[in-house]
């Protein structure tokens, strides 16, 4: 169930951190710290550097987010 008040943006993974955390550079020029959502974790979807991802941001803290989807690129099928 998707929450209504979340901000969804696209970006590129720039750094992989411990505990399934990633630094994501968003299309608007901001950089956020994001963790993986439960569905991605459960389905063993790998997030690598330079992957394009969709990130949900809370309107209360725009520096942290949740990666909800890894977008397809030409190189990964």
Curated annotation (Swiss-Prot):
It comes from the Eukaryota. Its main location: plastid. PANTHER family: TRANSLATION INITIATION FACTOR IF-1, CHLOROPLASTIC. One of the essential components for the initiation of protein synthesis. Stabilizes the binding of IF-2 and IF-3 on the 30S subunit to which N-formylmethionyl-tRNA(fMet) subsequently binds. Helps modulate mRNA selection, yielding the 30S pre-initiation complex (PIC). Upon addition of the 50S ribosomal subunit IF-1, IF-2 and IF-3 are released leaving the mature 70S translation initiation complex. Keywords: Chloroplast, Initiation factor, Plastid, Protein biosynthesis, RNA-binding, rRNA-binding. PROSITE patterns: S1_IF1_TYPE. SUPFAM superfamilies: Nucleic acid-binding proteins (SSF50249). GO terms for cellular component: chloroplast; cytosol. Gene3D superfamilies: Nucleic acid-binding proteins (2.40.50.140). This is Translation initiation factor IF-1, chloroplastic. The keyword rRNA-binding applies. Belongs to the IF-1 family.
């Amino acid at each position: 169930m998707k929450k209504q008040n979340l901000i969804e943006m696209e970006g590129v993974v720039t750094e992989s951190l411990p505990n399934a955390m990633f630094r994501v550079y968003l299309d608007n020029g901001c950089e956020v710290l994001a963790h993986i959502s439960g569905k991605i974790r459960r389905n063993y979807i790998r997030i690598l550097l330079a992957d394009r991802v969709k990130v949900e941001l809370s309107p209360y803290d725009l520096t942290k987010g949740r990666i909800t989807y890894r977008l397809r690129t030409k190189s990964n099928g």
